Amino acid sequence: MNPKDKRVNFGSMEPLIRDIGTVYEFYFDQNTFIESEIKTFLKEFETKRGDRDLYSLSQQTINANNTIVNINRSIHQSSQFLENINNNLNQINSKLSTQVENESIHQEQRNNDRLNKFELELVEKKSIEDSFNQRKSQIENDFNEKASVLRDKYQIVL
C-alpha cells in the first residue's frame, strides 16, 4: 500500500470550519456586545457630563450675577464717598491756597523788613564812618595845632 492511499478522508472541511467559526464568534467575538455597551456608557457619560456642565454653567451665571450686583452696589457707594472726598479735598485745597497766599505775603513782608534793616544798617554804618572820620580829622587837627604850639614853644625843627 501506498502512503497516499492510507489517508483518511473525512470529506469536505467547509462545514467543520463553519462550525468552528460559529463557536468562535459566539464565545470569543463580542464586538457587537462591546460596541453596544460602549455606546450606552458614552450616552450616559455625555448625559451626566451635560448635566454637570449645565449645573456648572448655572453656578457661574449665579456668581456672575452676584458679582454684577456687588459691582453696582460698590459703584453706587463709592460715588457717594467720592463726592464726600471730593468736597473735603476742595475744602482742603482752598485752605491750603489761602495759607500759601498768607505765607507769600508774610515772606514778602520779611523780605521787605530785611531790606529795610539792611538799608538802615548801611545808613548807620555810613553815619558811624562819617562820625569816625570827622573825629579822626578833628583829633588830627587838634594834634597838629598842639604840635605846632609845642614846636613854637620849644622851637623844635622837624
UniProtKB/Swiss-Prot annotation:
It comes from the Eukaryota. One of its GO terms (cellular component) is transport vesicle. Component of the biogenesis of lysosome-related organelles complex 1 (BLOC-1). Component of the BLOC-1 complex, a complex that is required for normal biogenesis of lysosome-related organelles (LRO). May play a role in intracellular vesicle trafficking. Belongs to the BLOC1S5 family. This is Biogenesis of lysosome-related organelles complex 1 subunit 5. The gene is bloc1s5.
